Amino acid sequence: MKKHLLPLALLFSGISPAQALDVGDISSFMNSDSSTLSKTIQNSTDSGRLINIRLERLSSPLDDGQVIAMDKPDELLLTPASLLLPAQASEVIRFFYKGPADEKERYYRIVWFDQALSDAQRDNANRSAVATASARIGTILVVAPRQANYHFQYANGSLTNTGNATLRILAYGPCLKAANGKECKENYYLMPGKSRRFTRVDTADNKGRVALWQGDKFIPVK
C-alpha cells in the first residue's frame, strides 16, 4: 500500500530506525471542516534530541511527486518548528492551514530533522550540547479541499474516486485465495481520479464487505 499511496521517505545517517524519533503515522489528514491538526512526537531514547521541522508542498504524495511552490508564504504554518526534546519525552506539534478555500486537495511533506545530543566540553564553567547522530524523516500531510465533493463508483470489486478528496477504502470478508486463509482485510488511500481493485478479499461473496470513509464519515458500499 505504501508503494502506491502516500509513501514515507526515511533517510538515516549514523543511527538505526529503532533509535529514530517517533513521529507517529506516516500519513496525516486535515479534513475539509478543520484548519488545524496536532501531531504528537515522542523521544523514546535515553538522550535528548534536537528537532527541526520543515514543510514542503508536493504536486503529489506518490513516488513521482515534485516539490512545488506554495500559493502564499503562510499557506501552512506550524509550531514549534524547532525544539529540544528531552529523553523519554513527548511534544505536540500543531499545524495551521491558511491557504485558499477552494476545491483543490493539497499535499505537503513534513521533513523532520532529528539529532541526538551528548554533553561535551564539560568543566566547572560551561557545558555545551553537540549533535552526535542524525536522521531525516519525511511524512505526508494531506489537506482536504475546503470545498470537498465526495463521489465514488463501485463495480466488480473495483472502487473509483470520482470526487476531489482522498478516500480511505476498506474491504473485508472471505479471502479470494485459499492460500491467504479464511478471512482477509484490505485498506488503502484512494486519491481523486484513481481506481483500486481489491485483490485479497472475495468481494463477490455475499459475506464480502466494502466500505469507505469520507473524512470522518463511514460509508458502507457493499
Curated annotation (Swiss-Prot):
One Pfam entry name: EcpB_C
Keywords: Chaperone, Fimbrium biogenesis, Signal
Signal peptide range in chain numbering: 1-20
InterPro entries per the UniProt record, alphabetical: EcpB_C, Ig-like_fold, PapD-like_sf
Induction: Negatively regulated by H-NS. Positively regulated by IHF and EcpR.
Keyword Signal: yes
The keyword Chaperone is annotated on this UniProt entry: yes
Ranges annotated as spanning the membrane: none
Function field: Part of the ecpRABCDE operon, which encodes the E.coli common pilus (ECP). ECP is found in both commensal and pathogenic strains and plays a dual role in early-stage biofilm development and host cell recognition.
Family: Belongs to the EcpB/EcpE family.
Protein name: Probable fimbrial chaperone EcpB
Lineage, opening ranks: Bacteria, Pseudomonadati, Pseudomonadota, Gammaproteobacteria, Enterobacterales
